[in-house]
Amino acid sequence: MNRNVDKGWQAQIRPNERQSIALQIAQTLRIISPSISEVQLMNMALSFERQAFDGASSKNEYLTTCGKKTAQLRDQIRDTLQATQMKQMPSVYNNAGNVGALPTAGPNRLANNPRVMPRLQNQNVPMQAGMQQFARNMKLTPQQRQFLLQQSQIQQQRQQQQQQSQQPQQTQQPQASSPTAPNTEANQQRSGSVPGRIVPALTQQQLNNLCNQITALLARNGNPPIPMQKLQSMPPARLISIYQNQIQKFRSLQHMQQQQQQQQQQQQQQQQQQQQQQQQQQQQQQQQQKQAPQNAFFPNPQGNVGAQSLQSMSPQDQPSTQQQQPQRTAAPPNNPNVNATNNNRINIEMLNIPVPKQLFDQIPNLPPNVKIWRDVLELGQSQRLPPEQLKLIGMLYRKHLQIILQHRQQQLNKIQNARMNSQNAPNTNKLGNPQPDNTGNPQAFSQQAFAQQQQQQQQQLHRTSNPTSASVTSQNGQQPINTKLSANAAKTNYQSYLTNKARNATQPTQPPVSQVDYSNNLPPNLDTSSTFRSSASPPSAFTKAGNEALSVPLSGARNTAASRPTNLAAGNSSASIVQQLLECGGTMGQQKMTSRIRELTERVMHSLMRPVPLDLPHDQKVMIASLIKSAYPMFSRTNQLICLFYCLTGNEEATIQLIQMRHIFKLQLEGLQQGVFTCAPQTLAKIKEKTSRYFAFVKAQLLRLHHEVNNNNMSIQNALAHISSLRTASINQQQQPQPQSQQQQQASQFPQAPSVSSNVRPINGSIPNAQPSVPGQAQPAAKANSVGNTSFPVDSKLAFQSLDVSQPDLQAKQKIASQVMKHGLKPEDLKLPPSKKKKIENLSTVQKPKDSVVNTPDVIMSSVDEIPSSVSPGTIAKEEGMAKAREEAIANPLKYAIDAFVAVDHEEEVSAIKSSQTPSSILKTPQSFFIPPSTPDLSFTDNKNSLSPSNILSLDGKFSFNDDSELWADLGNEINSEIGFLKEPDTMNLALDADKDKTKMQNKLTQINFDESCFLDPAIDDKDPWNEMLHEKKVLLKQLQVGNEDEDNIAFPTSTNIWQVVI
């Protein structure tokens, strides 16, 4: 079972790994059993490996089994060697002590043989090394190695003694005993009685290893093999000598191979050097061949077409004195070196110029991917073109060159004519400053202007063709340091080069416009449409990358704008306002403004959560795609809007909301490319509408700032301070009590409740030219009631007890309620189910949490009918809120329907929570629209510079901004109509407790700024139900922080129900 289950590890082991393991086992067995053949040993090792492989349950077990078997065999070998050594040690020492008793006949006979003795003498020196090498290869023990070393030393001493005791004359032995000396030596070696050599005692295992090594050396050296049986039958001395000889041959072969390799490397290096020299010679010959026909075509650089064109193409060869002395010519007329250099440069440039298709069509069998002359040159170098085609190509090349030179000459003539016409014009500019008179020497002036124009064009051409080989000029702008052009220059678009050169030549130079003329040219009525339409393009000072553009002064921007036509003066003035505002950074400074915007952006990015993809129907997906397409031109400029808005207002809460909306739009834009939808179409439409209001506010503030700077001659900081003071005065004016005429008018409408009606704000449309109030900003209730010129505090119970509700007042209230219901609250418009209608009718009898009760007209009527005769302060406060609700119900009936719908949903959620059943329809406010107040400001650590003004004002230019919500498009109203966008009062947060409302409203008045908060504060927009929920959530958070336990179970209504009613 285990084998079938654990088959995965066996597949991981490769066959060559298994083969290597079996080979190691076979080699170990060969040492133990040398008499067994290699085939049998290999079969035994393979069978053992197969059994271990099949019987193991894992790879580790398999490797462990094979390792243990190999270690066991090695231990057995070591034990055998030690036992054999201990047995042979006494006989070895006995033989070493009887060295002098050995026979001497052998050495004497060998010494008399002239052929054998020199060979023995030559073998004396390598014998010791051979024995040491043999001991190392045989893997002997240290004792055996020491014994062999002693034997070699004894042998060397004995040989020296024999050489000293030799006599000069010896008798020769008869030839009958041995026909030849080599045979005698061979017989002596076979018999094992080689004189002068002590053979070490070797075991059978060591002899077998020695035979195997001799067989391997014979195979490596290329000698014929010796059978194993014959080697085993040889004496040890003979085996050792054969081993040493083969070792020497092997070393000599290795040395020869190394020498051959070195020789081959040297030969290769020599061949490479020769090839490089040949290539250099060929290139030089080709260049000379090319120069020959072209020098014939340009025989002399004086006055002909070729010379003038070459001068235009090579301004770097002009001497440095040309700019200082324009009367002199560019180069000596008869200088052949200059002519050759010009020809070389024109040839290099011709290689990179695109060739018309009509010319290449005349060359037969030309590859289709050939576009320039460089490709043709490469084909010619690779010998892929026949000689007939080469002749045709040379003719077409000269024809093309002639056409280009003629065209350039025409362009140069146009430039000279334009310069001459400008010389004939009056020599004074707009400011009355005289210009230098060069009419006396028009030729010198034309040469100087022509040389300067050539230098500019040539430098631009070289930078575009090959930036790495552009010449480096010195600081004084005279002689260039590097005048070489790379042969591998990039391909340049010659047609665009000629177009740019012609446009630069024909464009007249505009004189600079002073700041006085700049402001005087503005129309008196401030044409806002033309002003801000031209400012859609970024200012020139901010087109540079990085923050370095911020240090460019305004004078530099005016100098760059001086070359533009004067009819764009109005547009440039508005762009200058934006530029000045971004440079100064508003009231806080540019550096602080940029760093603060980065901190706010990082804060928003860390607090937002990745939205969950929505499963929307097809029609809503189409709506989202349409909204993205229409809103993209506006959202592509939100970076600029964020900086401008923060410079103008300094409102961080509204800036955070704008950053949030930009991020939500960006996420949906990125998801739309992948088919992912993270935002509902209703939310996206609301984001688009609110962003357009941001743009409208910034336009109005820029108009006001432009008016203050240009008409009143104020600086940017002073103008911003003046506008801020106007905002403060407007806020104070709104907080003052209403005029007496309005109080009398309200008293005539509600005579029985003067204290209540005196504090009710009128509808915006009832008073002409009245400044609308801030949305969500209720007026503080009066602390004293005025009667004549005296005042008394509200908390006088006697005064309240004397008031009662009369019958005419009740009739007036019923009339108001009937008008409200008649205004437009129809069932088909509200689309409320019958169950919810019942709940709305019984809304007064249901107990509701505080701050979540919405006063409908029915509730107002029921509460009015139940007013007792003795009125308490709480009742007066409740009736004050009811009066406000009546007026707002008449002005906006649809909003009261939405509020009622929210109240019904809220009641269901409260009842579900009390019954410990959490409904599934409860939705929390998305994190993308709400940042907790406890979120700390995070420092900007990223090196991105996406919010710098230079990047903010950069445009993509991919869309035509025809949308009505474009940044600076079509302002038809005046400044006063653009400022404000004030909204209806917010009644979502009106509670029944008047004292609590007073304190809340007073806190709001102290926190809310001027009109930018009127439509930019996410908590004060009455027409945005989403912002109303956000305000409720903020109020709840504040109450939870205080420790109010009465509203712990308050939940928030879902946004989907609200949007269904709105749509």
Curated annotation (Swiss-Prot):
Q: Which Pfam families match?
A: KIX_2, Med15_fungi
* Entry-linked CDD domains: gal11_coact
Sequence ranges of Low complexity compositional bias = 149-175, 311-342, 443-460, 528-542, 733-758
Instruction: Tell me which InterPro entries the record gives.
Output: Gal11_coact, KIX_dom_sf, MED15_KIX, Mediator_Med15_fun
Grouped into one coarse class, the protein's main location is nucleus
Q: What's a single GO MF annotation on this record? A: mediator complex binding
Task: Report the residues modified as Phosphoserine.
Answer: S948
Origin: domain of life: Eukaryota
Q: Where does this one sit in the cell?
A: Nucleus
**Annotated GO CC locations:** chromatin; mediator complex; nucleus
Q: Where is the composition biased (Polar residues)?
A: 176-192, 301-310, 422-442, 461-482, 500-527, 766-776
Arranged from A to Z, the UniProt key words for this protein are: Nucleus, Phosphoprotein
Residue ranges for the region (Disordered) are 149-194, 286-342, 422-482, 500-544, 728-789
Q: Name one GO biological process term.
A: regulation of transcription by RNA polymerase II
Q: How does it assemble?
A: Component of the Mediator complex. Component of a med15-hrp1 subcomplex, which flexibly associates with the other Mediator components.
**Known role:** Component of the Mediator complex, a coactivator involved in the regulated transcription of nearly all RNA polymerase II-dependent genes. Mediator functions as a bridge to convey information from gene-specific regulatory proteins to the basal RNA polymerase II transcription machinery. Mediator is recruited to promoters by direct interactions with regulatory proteins and serves as a scaffold for the assembly of a functional preinitiation complex with RNA polymerase II and the general transcription factors.
- Family of this protein: Belongs to the Mediator complex subunit 15 family.
Query: What name goes with this protein?
Result: Mediator of RNA polymerase II transcription subunit 15
UniProt source species:
Schizosaccharomyces pombe (strain 972 / ATCC 24843) (Fission yeast)
